Amino acid sequence: MQLLTSVAAAAVLASTVSAANFTGDVLNGVPVIHDLILADVPAQKISRYYLRVGELNGGHPVHIPVMVARGTPESLETGKTLSLSAAIHGDELNPVRVVQRIFEQLEGEVATLNGTVIGLPTVNPMGIYLNQRNYFTASASGSLTNVNRVFPGTAPALGGSGPDILAFNIWNQLWANASAVDVGIDLHTPSSGGETSLWCYADWRAPYVERLSKLLQPDTLKVDVGEPGSIETTFVDYGVPSLTVEMGQAKVWNTSLIDRTVDFVNRVMRDLHIAPGNGTVEPDLSRVYIANTFHDTYTQYGGFVERLVAVDEPVTKGQPIAHVRNAFGDILETLVSPADGRMFQSPRDPSCEPGSSVGQIAYNSTDPECADGCILSGPAGSRRR
């Protein structure tokens, strides 16, 4: 951590609008805030802040970077606010570059924006540091927490742990306060070891979410009720349209998928009239596979997975999709597709243990209980969600 002297800090703060609840600290030349108030952010420019979101053992503060592209002065009243969040899972890195690219682009456009874009390129600082999915809490023997299951978080005074407080501060000091987010897009990849193309979770019961999901023009669009405690579902529960976007693989920057997602964000900004555009944005759905059900197939053995079907290939019920082999190369198990559909996620890491996924199939179930979305597992189709 590189804190400036009080004189240098004062100089930095003097060059910004004097508000936004600054803590008085400056980290790597960037002012630290504990609360974002858009009215206090300079209009027609991009501002950078660090938001203080908690503490580690030893009292070391935790910060996350925040970028704000605030448009014309009147756009706080006339325009909408879009939030882009990335890397709540620390190994999911394609989204980081999407947020960076959008704000690089907005440098030349912010003066005319009718609205505001808030960017969080790295939501989970502990996950980023450890280059893995979860937030590490050091107390006792240590534990790992999926931060995308604890929103809107828990306050320190109510016994919140590190990840709970991180979520609490992001929600209450950034999104649900005077920033008044109108649309939230949470960017992900699959967990390490898995591969997909471009897809999304979308709760079509919520206003504007169907439109938002189609603007993505994904390879697979999963109609889904969402996960309690996730960013997407928390936004939706509070009446804010939101989408979870999944991009390719963890721990890589896939330029093609980054480009497609940047294009998506631009379509959303035009659709919300934050950015200028000619006419209504018409998404191209000609290659979009819309499904209400994901069905996971898992192995009962430890060994090595041999994929037989690539991502986005069509499959038929009973078609072999993977072999599981032992160390000698013998086939221990052949997994088959549970239904006619499409391979939407497949393991890139061949190493597996009992219970590991060897492929997830997307399809449309005729079960009325799956009309708003289902996630099933195993040969019997046990319902996980």
Which residue ranges define each predicted feature?
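Structured catalytic-domain cores with a bias toward divalent-metal coordination
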Residues: 3-5, 17-385
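Hydrophobic h-region of N-terminal signal peptides that target proteins for export
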Residues: 10-18
